[in-house]
Amino acid sequence: MSWYEELDVWTADYLPDMAYEKDVPLRRYTSFRIGGAARRMAFPRSGEELVLLVSRALELGARPFVLGNGTNVLFPDEGVERLVVNTREMNRVCRGENENEIIAECGASMANMAVFAQKEGLSGLEFAHGIPGSVGGGVTMNAGAYGGELAQVIESVTVLFPDEGVRTLNAGEMAFSYRHSLLTERPEAVVLRAAFRLQPGKPEEIRKKMDELMARRKASQPLEYPSAGSTFKRPEGYFAAALIDQCGLKGLTVGGAQVSEKHAGFVINRGSAACADVTALMAEIQRRVKAQTGVELEPEVRVIK
């Protein structure tokens, strides 16, 4: 019996109320709108269900991959022979026990978390309002924008380490740096939830700041096209988009993938891009930038096999 047939039986017995689907097109669940089918996709509703599911999937060799909003990942056109664990049902955000604290589950969107904080009169997450990812992915990569990043406001993170169990780490233990954390080096680890320590503020002033940042984002970024956001990390001392623009690469196209003419830091799907188009275009950008400037660009987008 294959791993997925065994998992079919197990989920029916132990997680009968959890949504569980077969041969799911991944393009539906990624911001690039690219990707073949996942052999199986599960939608746990709680940390307990997720821990139980991932533990069993590992035992069966299902190579579970935990997917949030799918904003920083690219799946191959032939799909993946593994279990994709979709956290969309784990989207709760609430006040914490400590003053000025909120708790967000891994599947909550960064935007919804920022709006929750704003309505509660808590400041510190304004920068996150326009970031399209989920809390789990955002914490893992220390997401940020416009001078803010999650490391500035995180109090603790509860993580499933398959070989150690569930642990709660404080901000110092997370070893945050630019678009990096301890979890970047531990891809098997899964963020379950995070606690954020914010500052009191006036809801209307917080809302105004959020709207200003969103207006800047809409004016400068190609939000009308599918993409994974910033394609490359910022090299030390440089801006990736400026280097790409400097090299004359705006509009460069491979198949259905293109360097945005609005923002050179974005590779966009013009409507028919394949995974191979995007990866080939990224490689060509890296090659030309390296040749012309000497700077090596590091991808921010993860290609999942």
Give a label for each model feature.
Residues 16, 100, 153, 295-297:
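Residue-level signal for beta-strand positions within conserved beta-sheet cores that form or flank
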Residues 60, 67-69, 153, 225-226, ...:
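Short, basic and Ser/Thr-rich N-terminal targeting/leader segments
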Residues 21-22, 28, 73, 160-288, ...:
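Phosphate/pyrophosphate- and phosphate-bearing ligand-binding catalytic cores of soluble enzymes
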Residues 2, 31, 46, 55, ...:
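Generic serine detector
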Residues 74, 79-94, 98-217, 243-245, ...:
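C-terminal structural segment of proteins
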Residues 2-135, 143:
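Anion-binding (especially nucleotide phosphate/pyrophosphate-binding) glycine-rich loop
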Residues 11, 17, 33-41, 46, ...:
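Residue-level detector of solvent-exposed, low-hydrophobicity positions
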